[in-house]
C-alpha cells in the first residue's frame, strides 16, 4: 500500500476491552441484552448504539462501528449517521429457535481506532401466533365394559409451535356422563391428555361415544385446537397386555445407520386366542418421532428411519402401545439418548480482517474471528493455532473469539506478504481440523533512504567537449515501494565556494544523467568534485548523497612552446662554437614546454634544417644540440639551425626553434652582430614570465659575484690593460632552464667567457655561453676556480662546476 494513501497506523491497540456500552469500565464482561418482539416489521428501532457507547455522533462515525454476527447473518443493520440499531427484516422466533427458549441472537459490535469489540445479544420475544394442532384429528379408544371407574386412557397430545405460556396449558373434553380429561406433563415439559372413566359402561345401553377433545394454550387471548375421540365399548376381555418393563432407557450413537435396531420391547397377554394376540405401535408420537423411528407391529423392534443428529436432538421419549385383539392395550416409555460423535469439523467465522497493514506498527490487529463446533463435550472443545515462523500472535478472547495481531514490527522490504493459515482442531477422537488461509499484505512505510550504487563516482571528460554532453550517470535505488521509492536527483551546494558548479554540470532529476554545461579546458581545470543528492517522495522524504569526481582528460590542443633560445626575429640568439670543438661538443640546449599533459606533453626534438647537414645533431629526448664531427676551415663561420620540437599527441603538434651558431677560432674577439634595438618585452604567458624572472635573478647574482671578484683583482694590479669591447645581444638570459614536462634540467657544466672593455670606468662584461648545473635553492655548491689563460692583454675566464 502506498504511503501517499495516508494509511492510518493503528499502533498499540486495546485488544481486550470487554466493556459493552456501560456506565463504567469495570465489570463489563457480561453482554448487553436487547429485546424485540417477533414479527416486528423490518427497519424497526432496537436501540441507539451511539448513546450506549457514550460517543458523540462525529466520534461514532470516525470509529467505523460495525455489527457482525455468527455466520454473518444480517438480522440487524446500523445507521452510521444516527447510530440507530434497526431490524434488517421481520423475525420469526419459531424459524430462528424452534422450541428453544429463550430465543437469543448473539452479535458483536466492532470499533476501530483504537480497535475494540463488545458482546451483545438480541432476545426475540414469542407472541401467540400459533394455535394448538392435533396431528390425529380422530382418535379411537376401545374401553371394556368391565373397566372400573378411575381407569385412565392416555390420548394423543396436540402440538403448539409457541413456547412458554403461549404453549398448551390444558385439555378439556365435551360434556358427557362417563369420562373426564386430565392434563398430564411429561419429563420434557410437554403436556398430554388422559381420559379417565368416571362411570362404569354398559355396552347394551351405549355401545359407542363421540366426544370432542380441545387443547387450549396460555396466550391472551388463548388459542385452541380440537380432535374427535371415538370411544368403542367392547365386550369383556379379562386381561390387557403388559410390558416386561414400563420404562426403557437406551443409548445410540448419532452416526448409527438407517434401520439400525434401537431396542426391542416385549409385552405379554395372559388371555388366549385372539385376545392374546399383541400388536405394537407408536403412541402419541410427534411428527419428529414418527419420521425418525419405526416399530415392527409384530416383534416390537424399534428401528431408525433416518440419520440422527445430536446437534438437533439429544434425546427422544418414545411411547409404545401394545394392543391385543380384544382392544385392551398397555403402554411403555422408551427414552432414547443420542450419543455425540465427532462428526462436525470446527467452524471459523471471520468478523474483521485488515489487509494491507503498515510495516512499522507492532501489535496491529489483523483479524478478529470466532470458532465454534456443533459437537459437544470433548468433541466440541477447540484449539486454535497459526504457523510458528510468522511474526504474528494469536490471542484468545471471550466467547471463542480470537484476535490475530502483529507480534513485532514488520519489514515490507524483507517480506511484502504473509500467507497465514489458521488451524482449528477439536479434541475429539479422531480430531477434526479446519484450515483458514489468509493473505496478509504489508503496506510500505518510508523507512528506507535511497542508496547509491557507489559511494563515489569518477567520471572522465575529454576537454573541448561540446556543451550539454552526457558525461555519465549516478544511480540510486530505494527498497521502499510506490512513491516512497521514486527517487529524484539534485546537485548539492559545493564545499568549495569558488567552484562555479552551476555553470559546469547539470543533472536530470529523474534518471541521474549528468551533463557538461560548457566546454571544459584541461589547462584551466584538471578536475573537480561535487556531491549529488538522491531523495525519495515519501512523507517525510529521506535522502542520501554521493561524491562525484570529474577528471578532465587532456586533448592535444597546445603546441610546444620554446623557452630557450628565445625566438626573436630582431635579436636572434647566437651561440659561439670554437672550431677546435670535439665531436659531441654541447652547443646549446633547446628548452620547450607543452601546456598539455601526459603523452601530449612528451616532447621530442629533431634537426629540421641546417646550413651544413651532418655538422650538428640534436638529441631527441632532451633537445641538446651537439657537434656531430670535427669542425674544419671549410665550414662556414655562420651556421643556421632549425630545430623541430614535436609532442606525442594524436595528431602531434609542433614548433620550431631557430639557432644561429658562430664558428670562431677563439673566444678573445668574437664577432656578434649588434641588434638595432633592444626588443620590446612581449606579452608572455605566466609560465614564461616566471621562468624569465628566475633566470634573471640568478644571472644578476652571478654577475654581481663576478664583478666583485674582478674589482678585487684590478685593485691588486697596477698596470692598465686594454681589451677589445665585446658586443653581445641585450636581453634576458635564463639562469635556470628547466624542462617542466620531464625532460630534466641542464646537467652539463657551463663555460662562461668574460670580456672586459679597457678604458671603461665600469668595465662591463657579458657571459657568452652559460652552461649551468642544477641549482638548488639558488646557491652555488662548487667553488669557483680561476683560469690564468689571458688573451690580448687582460682577460680571464671562470668555470662553474
Swiss-Prot record:
Residues 1-29 form the signal peptide. Disulfide bonds join 97-103. Residues 711-801 are cytoplasmic. Residues 30-691 are extracellular. The chain crosses the membrane at residues 692-710. It is found in: Cell membrane. One of its GO terms (molecular function) is identical protein binding. Residues 36-134, 139-243, 248-348, 353-452, 457-562, 569-672 form the Cadherin domain. Keywords: Calcium, Cell adhesion, Cell membrane, Disulfide bond, Glycoprotein, Membrane, Metal-binding, Repeat, Signal, Transmembrane, Transmembrane helix. InterPro entries: Cadherin-like_dom, Cadherin-like_sf, Cadherin_C, Cadherin_CS, Cadherin_N, Protocadherin/Cadherin-CA. The keyword Calcium applies. Calcium-dependent cell-adhesion protein involved in cells self-recognition and non-self discrimination. Thereby, it is involved in the establishment and maintenance of specific neuronal connections in the brain. This is Protocadherin beta-8.
Amino acid at each position: 500500500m502506498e504511503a501517499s494513501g495516508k494509511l492510518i497506523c493503528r499502533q498499540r491497540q486495546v485488544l481486550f476491552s470487554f466493556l459493552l456500552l456501560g456506565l463504567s469500565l469495570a465489570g463489563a464482561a457480561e453482554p448487553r441484552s436487547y429485546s424485540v418482539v417477533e414479527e416486528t416489521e423490518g427497519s424497526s428501532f432496537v436501540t441507539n448504539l451511539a448513546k450506549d457507547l457514550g460517543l458523540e455522533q462525529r466520534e461514532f462515525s470516525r470509529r467505523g462501528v460495525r455489527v457482525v454476527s455468527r455466520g454473518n447473518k444480517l438480522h440487524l443493520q446500523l445507521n452510521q449517521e444516527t447510530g440507530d440499531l434497526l431490524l434488517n427484516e421481520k423475525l420469526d422466533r419459531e424459524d430462528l429457535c424452534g422450541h428453544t427458549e429463550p430465543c437469543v441472537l448473539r452479535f458483536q459490535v466492532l470499533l476501530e481506532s483504537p480497535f475494540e469489540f463488545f458482546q451483545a445479544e438480541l432476545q426475540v420475544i414469542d407472541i401467540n401466533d400459533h394455535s394448538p394442532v392435533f396431528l390425529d384429528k380422530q382418535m379411537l379408544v376401545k374401553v371394556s365394559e368391565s373397566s372400573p371407574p378411575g381407569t385412565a386412557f392416555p390420548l394423543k397430545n396436540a402440538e403448539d409451535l409457541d413456547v412458554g405460556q403461549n404453549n398448551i396449558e390444558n385439555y378439556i373434553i365435551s360434556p358427557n356422563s362417563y369420562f373426564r380429561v386430565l392434563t398430564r406433563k411429561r419429563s420434557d415439559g410437554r403436556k398430554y391428555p388422559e381420559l379417565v372413566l368416571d362411570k362404569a359402561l354398559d355396552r347394551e345401553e351405549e355401545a359407542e361415544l363421540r366426544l370432542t377433545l380441545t387443547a387450549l394454550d396460555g396466550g391472551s387471548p388463548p388459542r385452541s385446537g380440537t380432535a374427535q375421540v371415538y370411544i368403542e365399548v367392547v365386550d369383556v376381555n379379562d386381561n390387557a397386555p403388559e410390558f416386561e418393563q414400563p420404562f426403557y432407557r437406551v443409548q445410540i450413537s448419532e452416526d448409527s445407520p438407517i434401520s439400525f435396531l434401537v431396542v426391542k420391547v416385549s409385552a405379554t397377554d395372559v388371555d388366549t386366542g385372539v385376545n392374546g394376540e399383541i400388536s405394537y405401535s407408536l403412541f402419541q408420537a410427534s411428527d419428529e418421532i414418527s419420521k425418525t423411528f419405526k416399530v415392527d407391529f409384530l416383534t416390537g423392534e424399534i428401528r431408525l428411519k433416518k440419520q440422527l443428529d445430536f446437534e438437533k436432538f439429544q434425546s427422544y421419549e418414545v411411547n409404545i402401545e401394545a394392543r391385543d385383539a380384544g382392544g385392551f392395550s398397555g403402554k411403555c416409555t422408551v427414552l432414547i439418548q443420542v450419543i455425540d460423535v465427532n462428526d462436525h469439523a470446527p467452524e471459523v467465522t471471520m468478523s474483521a480482517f485488515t489487509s494491507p497493514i503498515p510495516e512499522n506498527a507492532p501489535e496491529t490487529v489483523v483479524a478478529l474471528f470466532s470458532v465454534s463446533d456443533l459437537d459437544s463435550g470433548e468433541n466440541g472443545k477447540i484449539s486454535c493455532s497459526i504457523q510458528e515462523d510468522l511474526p504474528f500472535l494469536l490471542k484468545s478472547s471471550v466467547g471463542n473469539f480470537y484476535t490475530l495481531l502483529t507480534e513485532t514490527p514488520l519489514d515490507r522490504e524483507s517480506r511484502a506478504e504473509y500467507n497465514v493459515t489458521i488451524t482449528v482442531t477439536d479434541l475429539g477422537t479422531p480430531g477434526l481440523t479446519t484450515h483458514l488461509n489468509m493473505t496478509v499484505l504489508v503496506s510500505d512505510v518510508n523507512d528506507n533512504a535511497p542508496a547509491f550504487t557507489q559511494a563515489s563516482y569518477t567520471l572522465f571528460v575529454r576537454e573541448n567537449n561540446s556543451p550539454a554532453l552526457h558525461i555519465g550517470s549516478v544511480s540510486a535505488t530505494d527498497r521502499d515501494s510506490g512513491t516512497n521509492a521514486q527517487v529524484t536527483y539534485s546537485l548539492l551546494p559545493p564545499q568549495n565556494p569558488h567552484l562555479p558548479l552551476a555553470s559546469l554540470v547539470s543533472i536530470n532529476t529523474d534518471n541521474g544523467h549528468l551533463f557538461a554545461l560548457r566546454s571544459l579546458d584541461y589547462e584551466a581545470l584538471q578536475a573537480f568534485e561535487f556531491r549529488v543528492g538522491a531523495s525519495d517522495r515519501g512523507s517525510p522524504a529521506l535522502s542520501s548523497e554521493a561524491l562525484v569526481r570529474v577528471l578532465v582528460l587532456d586533448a592535444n590542443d597546445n603546441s610546444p612552446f620554446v623557452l630557450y633560445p628565445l625566438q626573436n626575429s630582431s635579436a636572434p640568439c647566437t651561440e659561439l662554437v670554437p672550431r677546435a670543438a670535439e665531436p659531441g661538443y654541447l652547443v646549446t640546449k633547446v628548452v620547450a614546454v607543452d601546456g598539455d599533459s601526459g603523452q601530449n606533453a612528451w616532447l621530442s626534438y629533431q634537426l629540421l634544417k641546417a646550413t651544413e647537414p651532418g655538422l650538428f645533431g640534436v638529441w631527441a629526448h632532451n633537445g641538446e644540440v651537439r657537434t656531430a664531427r670535427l669542425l674544419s676551415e671549410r665550414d662556414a663561420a655562420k651556421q643556421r639551425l632549425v630545430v623541430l620540437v614535436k609532442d606525442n599527441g594524436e595528431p602531434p603538434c609542433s614548433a620550431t626553434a631557430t639557432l644561429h651558431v658562430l664558428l670562431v677560432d677563439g673566444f678573445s674577439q668574437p664577432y656578434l652582430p649588434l641588434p638595432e634595438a633592444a626588443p620590446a618585452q612581449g606579452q608572455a604567458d605566466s609560465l614564461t614570465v616566471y621562468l624569465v624572472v628566475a633566470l634573471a635573478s640568478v644571472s644578476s647574482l652571478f654577475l654581481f659575484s663576478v664583478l666583485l671578484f674582478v674589482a678585487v683583482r684590478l685593485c691588486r694590479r697596477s698596470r692598465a690593460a686594454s681589451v677589445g669591447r665585446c658586443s653581445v645581444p641585450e636581453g634576458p638570459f635564463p639562469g635556470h632552464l628547466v624542462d617542466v614536462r620531464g625532460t630534466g634540467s641542464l646537467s652539463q657544466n657551463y663555460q662562461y667567457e668574460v670580456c672586459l672593455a679597457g678604458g671603461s670606468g665600469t668595465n662591463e662584461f657579458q657571459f657568452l655561453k652559460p652552461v649551468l648545473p642544477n641549482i638548488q635553492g639558488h646557491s652555488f655548491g662548487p667553488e669557483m676556480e680561476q683560469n690564468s689563460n689571458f688573451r690580448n692583454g687582460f682577460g680571464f675566464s671562470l668555470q662553474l662546476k
